[in-house]
Each structure stands twice: as structure tokens, then as C-alpha cells.
Amino acid sequence: MNKDNKVIQLDQSFSKSGGEGQVTLIKNSQALYGKETVAKEYFKTPDQDKKAKISYMTSVDATSLLDVTAWPIDAIFEKQSKQLVGYIMPYTGAREPIHNLYTPTSRMKHFPRANWKFLLFVAVNVARAFSKVHKAGHLIGDVNHSNILVGTDSKVVLIDTDSFQVRAPKKTYLCDVGVKDYLPPELFGKNLKQVVRSQNHDNFSLSIILFQILFLGRHPFMGRMTTGEDVSLEAAVERLLYAFSSNARGNHVQPPPPHMSFQSTDLPRYVSDLFERSFSKKCLTSGRPSASEWATSLDKLRRELVECTSNSNHHHAKGMSCAFCRLDQERIKKNRSPIFGTPTKGKSGGLLRRAPQKKRPIRAPQKVSPLQGTTPLALSQLAPEAEFHNLSGVIGPETYVERLKQSGGAALAVLVAVGLLDSGAVFLGLLGPAAWLGMATIQRVKSLGWAPQHAAWMLLPGVNVGLAIYLAMAKRKM
């Protein structure tokens, strides 16, 4: 029952277990609260301090926080003993933990239309959510990537609010838990049950979350020591070995190489400088960027984003090069999916989905008059399932050649395909500069239908300016 002695009807068909308790949808929430709500029932009877904290949180006007937090709006009492056993909070809807935005695989599964512009929207919303909590006089405290939920609308909700540090008129209810990956180093080794946290502590944790959003899951202290020393992530945080710092070499640490990771130099200075301040030893006591400062700067970056001229699914700051073209080139070499999926045609509008790839039937080569022991092939016969990866996605050979014809006159001059005795194929391409820039790799060629003793080749028209040679090996699965 709730504090008004009204019976709470639980819908056991929608129930999830957490670390502290069970969260269940309330059947009669519309009648009781006029909106969808859930009940969190503790596995263990909470202590007196926790009960007092929940009682206070449910008694204050938290209207300004309800759109960004799962703030308790009512308490749950056991019917017989009248003991507080949990609380009621707004239902957050279909949202995912923020870490599901970090990697291409989890993004494609949970946020298939997300690109970096979307991630920037999320980062702004995270900073604004922190700012609202801070303005209300409270702190998140236990910041980690599991208690920040994100929807496909980019809106953010902070959960586990009963662990917040809550300021009441006569008492401050502390946050006695924390995750070391996000805990500021000045709190390492401290008894959190006795620590009154400050906004500067929250600001450190917020900066790590924002870094992971923008850097696609990278932790700011996950670098490599140039001295060969083996340093754990926890030790790196404690020593403030910020791997992406402009002074990283002075600390004998370096980030992953540019072809493998987003870099601080891929951000405008007014953003990268905030990370420098966040993870600087000078800011151990004060001076880390506030949540509102982060929100302002990230929103400025969001408004200054431009769409990449080579890939409609990539975005970058105005006047800067596209980091994701650089990263995708390396991923394609390793036969891995693009960071943000295949671009769609036209403008992105901030959210794109992976364009479905049409499977075309394999066609046998036409029989034509042999030429010097070879069988010439028409373009339509040339690897109907070959995938040409360029900066604008995966295209077929016909589309690729058409794009080359429009690329400024320097087009593909000669394409020679040689059948091998082991059923594989080698493509040797002589490319003009525009063609060379346009194509990242030929991913695979299969089922060409060539006899092993034959070679197939074709001359394509075009002006060849400055030849470059590209060799790709494609093994056909038997």
C-alpha cells in the first residue's frame, strides 16, 4: 500500500530485478497517479536512514526533476507492519543503459539509426540532467553507465535516485556507493559512508561519461605507458594519467593510434579544453567544468556540426576533417562493419538507419568470342555480388563506375580480373586520383563463374591521370 493507504496492484508480467530490489509495473497507476509508474521493492528491509531519505524525497516538490530522473513520488509500505519496503517512481519507458550506445554492434542492435550527431544530442541531455539535479541542491554520487538510460529520442533519465546525495533542510543524506571507473581520485580509499560529496566530484564522473559518449566507449584513462609499465585503469585514474591529454607524453602515456580511435584533436579546442580541465591535477579540489558549462559547450558543438561531404552518416565540427571516414577506412580493411552503418541517400536529419543491402542473383558470364585466350566480360557480368566500399557506403560495380564518371574526369582506366587455380580471385586496378580517393577497398568477390585457365579483362573509357595500383585478394568460399 502507499502512504495514503491505497492498495497498489502489481503487474508481475513486467518485473525486473536489480542489485537492491525488484522493479514491477503498477496496474492501477493511472487511477493513483495519472501516469504510468513502477514500484521498487527492496530485497532487504532498508535501515532507518534509508527510510528517512525515501520519506523526505517523496514529500518534496520534485517537478523540475521528474523529466530527467526516476525520482520517488510515493512510498510503499507493508500492509501488516506498516514498514517502508520500497517506493514508487515514474515509468521511464523503453530506454537502454547508455553503454549500449558505445560500440557499433550494440548501437546497431539498440539504436540502429544513431550517428555521432545523435550521440552529441545524448551528451547534451546528460549534461543538462546533471545540471538540473545540481541546481536542486542534490548530487548523483554513484555515477556509472548503468544508471543513465537513453531512449531513441535521445532523451536521458537518471535512475537509482535513492542512492543520490540528497540535501534536506536539516540533514544531508549521503551517497555511500560508487564505481571506481568513475570515482574521482580524491575519493579513492575514503569511506563513502562518511563523505559529503561536492559538485566537483560529480563533475569528474560526468566528464568521463561524456568522454565515453563522444569517443565511442573509450575511457579517458585507458592509454598505454611509453615506459612499458603495466598500469591498471584504476591506477591510471588515481594518478590522473589522462591518455588523450595534450601533455600525455609528459606523463609517459599515449592514446590508441588515430586509425583506431577518436582523438581529442578531432574536437574543437573549446571542448577538448574542458576534458583537460576535468582530468587535471589542478582541479582536484575545485575548477572542473560544471554540468551547465558542459551543456553549453556541447550544444554549441551540436549547432556547428556539418555533414561529411563523403558520407551522409558522418558529422564533424565545422572546419575540421571527418574522423569517422578515417576510422571506417581501417575497419573496412579488417572486414568490419562501419562505425555508424551504411549511409542512406540525401540528408541525414541527425538519425540514419542502415540501408538494406539488396541481394542480386549470381549470373553466369555470357559466351562471347574469345580474345587471345581470354573471355571478355561485360560490366553487368563482372562480379554481380562484388561490394565496392567507398566513403559513401557499399555499392555494386555498375554504380561505382557511374560515380567515377562523375568524379571530375579522372576515372578508372583499366580493371583486370585474373582467375586463380585455387578458385579465388585477384583484382588489379589501375586507378585515377579521383577513383583512388573514392574507393577504400574491394571487400569480396565470389562466384564469378570463371574457368581457372581463363583470364577476364575489360577496358573502360576514361581519362587516366596519375595511375595508382590497388591490389585486393578475395577468397571464394566453396
Regions found by a protein language model. Give the residues of each.
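Conserved end of the kinase activation segment
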Residues: 187-200
